[in-house]
Amino acid sequence: MSRIRLVDSVKAAGUAAKVAPGDLERILAGLPRDPSVEDRVIVGTRHNEDAAVVRLPGGQSIVQTLDFFTPIVNDPYHFGRIAAANALSDVYAMGGEPWCAMNIVCFPVKRLPESILADILRGGSDALREAGAALVGGHSVEDDELKYGLSVTGLIDPEIIASNAGLRPGDHLLLTKPLGTGILATAVKANWPGCDAHEEELFRWASRLNKGAGRVIRELRLKAATDVTGFGLGGHCLEMAGASGVTVALDTAALPVLPGVTELAGMGLVPEGSHANRAHCHKHVHVAPGVSPVLVDVAFDAQTSGGMLLAVSPDQMDAATTLLAETGDPAYPVGEVLKPLPGGVRLLLR
């Protein structure tokens, strides 16, 4: 039997299928808030955070998130692991530890065999086991397009929360995974020459848990972090800069890039979601003369289960890189936090 190409069954792959940031911003702006329950919300929707932090009776707090998307790879087990790793990342990004999770399934039962879904769920279950989180249920609907993800609940110390609003001038920025998953996923979906190798590289990185980075946040009590996903490194930096009232400077020549990504981007294999990210951000971005247009595309590439971006003070750099090395995670220095630049520039690509 021929191999089923899951990516051919969907319009857009992975986090590139997200609603464009500008559209989402307009939609959410009209949602009302309920003042009667605001006192239980420690971190909510104000700064586009990775997850919510909610206060419970008795002094405990939980972190909650959900994430689901369409396939970015063809192997169903790999897709399940990637989707679970991506959902877990939001908990790690806040400084929490995953506790339990529930599956979210949209499945075309008339077009794909049940074995596909079984393998997807097995991949998700294995990722949760690695994270030490319990799978406690889920919900499924029949859909024209395959989608999978999880709702994750974690435990968190309310005194140790990393947020988008915690950047401070002088902080160094460390990234824990190379960039380019959106571009590789585009090549896989296009069945581009060499796409099997691209798919293996994609799985290798996108299935890695950001567990080690979460440990760094807790042990060093970091104030700012985010996982780099659908809005790209540039888009997430812009969110953090706006929430913190600072400017973020990214050193484009230092950006870690997955094998083959720059060549593919140079040929125009950039997902539509990445173009939307760049268009949404352009008013607050300054690109220095001489910066490669391809690296600008990489900076805004819509990542799926990307790395953690950690804001680390100069005196914490050695400790952060040591802790990451202990769990086998890279620590790529990609930029720094500056005082606000004139003209509303929140992101400098230099």
Curated annotation (Swiss-Prot):
Site positions for Important for catalytic activity: K18
Reactions this protein catalyses: hydrogenselenide + ATP + H2O = selenophosphate + AMP + phosphate + 2 H(+)
One BP term from GO: selenocysteine biosynthetic process
Family membership noted in the UniProt record: Belongs to the selenophosphate synthase 1 family. Class I subfamily.
Protein name in UniProt: Selenide, water dikinase
Pfam families recorded: AIRS (PF00586), AIRS_C (PF02769)
Binding site for ATP: K18, H47, N48, E49, D67, D90, G138, H139, S140
Keyword match Magnesium: yes
Single Gene Ontology MF annotation: magnesium ion binding
